[in-house]
């Protein structure tokens, strides 16, 4: 069985640039692996597996990406209005206690909606950023129906339209970093950490911040091994 890559470990270091053709994608919150992990310990993670240009199997544990979506807000709103809304959402009965503090931050941006005729007008949106995908989905549910917040809209119910909420966090990260699902990526030397002990059966096992991954154009096909049985 020596021909199996997993049985031929390499003495890995972070002294070299790595180019990897992606074979597989996985994503998870830390809580999915250990139910005791909550709060700041419950982060969103992505695992990329692939083959590098030296034919080594590689597992890339990607950290630091925060799921987010947008809601449309009135054009006269300031950050203080969004703060009131965010605090009300954290206390909403639909939010499980484990996610109440996982709405990490928010900001106001101006964008042009993709749908509908708006001429060239720009509209205000609140960008809500979350610690993990569990909170990302939980907070969406609040906005799927009219919401009443005492200090907003005179205490009357208001429907906040969701935008880009259907884009899963892993796909969002791929788009942000311009990565193709089965394409090539580059990670520069010193930008990643070699996991010791390894977290996988791959020959190269590393952890890297998502901002250090770059999608690249490359026509070569990695030396991928396919296994099957009758």
Task: Walk through the language-model features, giving the residues of each.
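The two-metal-ion catalytic cores of nucleic-acid processing enzymes
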Residues: 1-229
